[in-house]
Amino acid sequence: INICLITKKELKDSNSYLAQGGISVCRGKEDREDYIEDTLIAGHYKNDRKAVEILVDESEEAVKTLIEMGVKFTGDKKGLFYTREGGHRKFRILYCEDRTGKYIMESLIKKVLEKKNIKIIENCEFLDIIEENNNCLGIVAKNKEIFSIKSKFTVLATGGIGGIYKNTTNFSHIRGDGIAAAIRHNIELKDISYVQIHPTTFYAKDNERKFLISESVRGEGAVLLNQKFQRFTDELKPRDEVTRAILEEMKKDKSEYEWLDFSTIKLDIEKRFPNIYKQLIKKDINVL
């Protein structure tokens, strides 16, 4: 099968590349039910249970595949290291330092580039679907000039709408192009009202993409403090609950931000979160 992969910017310019914290994996049969329940709780039981079960049951094999593809998760001679993130009762998050998305995506991109049957067109904008008699025949795209790509199968993997927000950790070009095209062509969409808001980013007044402060920072012990330097929530609740708690505290404090205290982290911060540490140093913040 011949595949044509187009991407709006460069291959690495995806939100997956920006992910820091890690990837959750089932820790054996004894963890299965807990993992499923944690996921259902975080989704307020609106999840598709079958999809959750598939996610959990296939997680170990998926991680093995990533390792075979060259992803080097953090660990030592004794085995891989696990951290904890919001909504998880156990340490079941594998990670690559604090740039997990970068390392996973680079391994996947390397594999894609090795495939002779995959043609890649970067800096190419998807414009619309080609529809005839209620069938999708391909797409219309723009790469300097407008052109069409005919195909038997068309997969829209264009991401969400994070780029349209004023304050976002997403790339600005991630603006829901695929979702918009699907709506125009009456393609069924599901749960598009759900937009995941990450609770913690570095506060800045500019309009640039905000720097993500990984959830695993809280998983390793960092705590949220208000303007009186008082802890006000459980930092490892699901993301929507932590985000809501921060917003409510900001309203009480009449503040545009709250504090994330690194002093409660017992690990070597510079070693565990090297990229976050470097980026904060650039912003004149030393968390050591």
Where are the regions that the model predicts?
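A short alpha-helix-loop-beta-strand transition element characteristic
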Residues: 16-17, 46-53, 63-80, 188-191, ...
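Glycine-rich FAD pyrophosphate-binding loop
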Residues: 2-23, 27
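Short beta-strand to alpha-helix junction loop
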Residues: 47-60, 92-110, 121, 168-176, ...
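Flavin (primarily FAD) binding-site architecture
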Residues: 156-170
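An anion/pyrophosphate-binding glycine-rich loop and adjacent beta-alpha core
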Residues: 11, 181, 187-288
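Short hydrophobic core segments
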Residues: 149-159, 182, 229
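Glycine-rich active-site loop/strand segments that organize a redox cofactor
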Residues: 25-55
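Conserved redox-cofactor binding core of oxidoreductases
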Residues: 67-145, 157, 202-203, 224
